[in-house]
Every structure is written in C-alpha cells, then in structure tokens.
Design a protein with these regions (language model features):
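Cell wall/extracellular polymer interaction/catalysis modules
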Residues: 20-176, 182-205
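N-terminal Sec-pathway targeting helices
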Residues: 1-9
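Hydrophobic alpha-helical membrane-insertion segments, chiefly the h-region
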Residues: 10-18
C-alpha cells in the first residue's frame, strides 16, 4: 500500500511538472498578444492582468504580468462562476445579464469601489471591451477578494459551492466576478493604483 501511494504521488508530481511547463509557455505567448493589444488601445505597457480559465481550477490561473521583466510578478488561484451548469471542472461562459456566468474577453480595470454586499468590502470595477463581455458593468462584474487558499490545491478542484479544502473554507460566491484570495487582492490594487495608464485584464481559456 505504501509503495502504491508513493508511485501515485510520483506520477501526480510528474504530471504537475509537465503540464506546468507547457502552461508557462502558453502564458508567454498570451502575454505577447496582450502587449500588442495594450499598445494599440492605450493601456499600460508595464503590467497587465491575465486569467486562464482553461487551466485546472486547483492551479494558479490569475497573473499580474510584468512586461518589462517578461514574467508574472504575482499569481494565485481564481474561482470561476457557477451559472448555467458550470462545474468545478468546467466553467460555462456567457455575457447575458442574469446568467451568473464568467465572461471571456478584454476588460479595462477601473476604480476601486466599496460594495454593499458584503458590506464594506472593496472591489475593482471592470469594463468589458468585447462582444463576449460588453455587459460587465451592468452585471456588476468585479475583481474581488474571497476566501480562497493562497497556494495551489491541484489536483483538487475549487468547488463552485461552499466547501473545505485542507481546512480552508472556500466561498467563491462568483456570479461572474473574478474572485481571488484576500491576501493577493491588495497586490492587484497596488499595481492598478500605481499605474499612470489603465490596466488591461484579459480573461481567456
């Protein structure tokens, strides 16, 4: 039994390393595309935000990308929404009001606001710039902090309902919002507020 457990653990580690390397390569390519978009549309060419919903939800898939350094300077878990049959493994995307789905596309990151629910909590306003997310402002789509671990939980998945993982109570509560851990949110706000130009967020799969 012990030998079997060791072999399974080794296989999972190998799988993680292999998929991790391929994912980082894809991230580099996405960052190059993002830089061109930022140049053409007047966004910051120092930083952008990237979310890859094509990745396993137990892995980091939210990134602050530093164009000057050519690498992410912050990365963390990011929950997707639960609407229209979305599961922990596979999100469903929609731009419809009332769909409670995540939306793909480019966003302009706006000001930080104080939410009424949960009362007093801060969040960053998002403006959808594509046909796939044009209703973002009407839907109240935000970047906001929630109870998520500060570390990857792969091969476990982030559930779309309240659940516990490694003793951490996970409450994604996303109805389309980009939800990240509390401790990582402050770094995002700091990056947004220190920029002389608006930041672009790109959500893709």
């Amino acid at each position: 039994i012990l030998l079997t457990a060791i072999l399974v653990g080794a296989m999972l580690l190998l799988l993680f390393l292999i998929t991790g390397n391929s994912a980082l390569g894809d991230l580099d390519e996405r960052a190059e595309e993002a830089l061109e978009y930022c140049k053409e549309n007047g966004y910051s060419t120092d930083y952008c935000l990237l979310v890859d919903y094509g990745w396993h939800s137990g892995r980091v898939r939210f990134f602050i990308w530093d164009f000057n350094k050519g690498k992410p300077v912050m990365k963390c878990l990011c929950a997707h929404s639960y609407g229209q049959g979305s599961t922990a493994r596979k999100p469903v995307f929609s731009n419809e009001i009332g769909s409670f789905c995540s939306s793909l596309g480019h966003y302009r990151v706006g000001r930080e606001k104080t939410m009424s629910k949960p009362k007093g909590r801060k969040a960053l306003v998002l403006y959808g710039k594509d046909k796939t997310n044009s209703n973002a402002l009407k839907r109240g789509i935000l970047i906001r902090p929630v109870s998520l671990p500060n570390f990857p939980i792969y091969p476990l998945l982030i559930p779309v309902k309240v659940h516990k993982v490694f003793g951490h109570k996970i409450r994604p509560k996303s109805e389309g919002c980009i939800t990240i851990p509390f401790r990582k949110y402050s770094r995002v706000v700091e990056t947004v507020k220190s920029s002389s130009k608006p930041l672009m967020l790109w959500v893709y799969e």
